[in-house]
Amino acid sequence: MKQWFEEEDFWINYAPIMFDDARWAEAPDVAEYVKSIANLKDGDSVLDAGCGLGRISVELAALNLKVTGVDIIQSELDAAAESAAAEGVELELINADLRTFSSSKKFDCAVNLYTSFGYCATEEEDLIIIKNIFDSLKDGGTFILECVSRETAIMYFT
């Protein structure tokens, strides 16, 4: 049985609410911040784990980074590809479950942003995701994990 976050219909219905105009407008600043705090240089590689619609992936690519986005929902990846094409940037997009994701490619930085973590039914599954992301990093690579507190979620989503 699929978990709720694996259901494509959920994301099709929820995405317009979760990713309103304000969320899209902040994406360039978020990407700049990621590049800055991870000390990334042009041409460095970034894994966007749980990239969804590509909101941040596209902006990171626009900053001359090589971006690979991974998501479990194919329609989200299709939307990310459309956004990348519209902005004239390249993304590598992979349809995969982060619980089983593995890459022979190693990244300078990995990000998991904006409520893309903590969906799994068990802590063990969440830890597997963290390990898989960590294992995808080059030695000395940076992992940026954004977690939303209960208070923040209540403020934004109620």
Task: Describe these PLM feature segments.
Residues 45, 140-142:
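Short glycine-centered segments of the SAM/dcSAM-binding site in methyltransferase folds
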Residues 57-100:
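Class I SAM-dependent methyltransferase SAM/SAH-binding core
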Residues 127-139:
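A short glycine-rich, Lys/Arg-flanked "PGG" loop and its adjoining helix->strand segment in the class I
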Residues 1-41, 43-52, 142-158:
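Conserved class I S-adenosyl-L-methionine
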Residues 113-115:
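Residues lining the SAM
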Residues 102-109:
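A short acidic, Gly/Pro-enriched loop at the edge of an enzyme's catalytic core
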